[in-house]
Amino acid sequence: MRHNFKVIEKKWQKKWEDAKVFEAQDFSDKKKFYGLVEFPYPSGAGMHVGHIKAYSSVEVVSRKRRMEGYNVLFPIGFDAFGLPTENYAIKTGTHPRQITDQNIARFTEQLKRVGFSFDWSRVILSLIHI
């Protein structure tokens, strides 16, 4: 019997999202743990294996802390200004804000599909409104 991993993963990710399993609780009496990864530059066509490698260790520790009963804050964000974004916009001939919004949407979808347990209710953006 073969498993359809795309269906199974999607099902469980939806259940976890609906149950807000990965959201930190404000004013909780539980011990606290703060996990943070370097925010990606949304200045390319998408994630690569380096992103997965860089985030996996903090992902593992964050999940372990949740299982130990900690209130875990593990936000994600996007470092969406500066030369990488400008260079990618010039390369593609697209306005920096438009390309940034498109890439943030793509990165978000990819990070969710991988199954990282980020607190998506607390996304941090380092961009100025353009």
Feature-to-residue mapping (PLM):
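N-terminal, positively charged nucleic-acid-binding surface of large information/translation enzymes
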Residues: 1-128
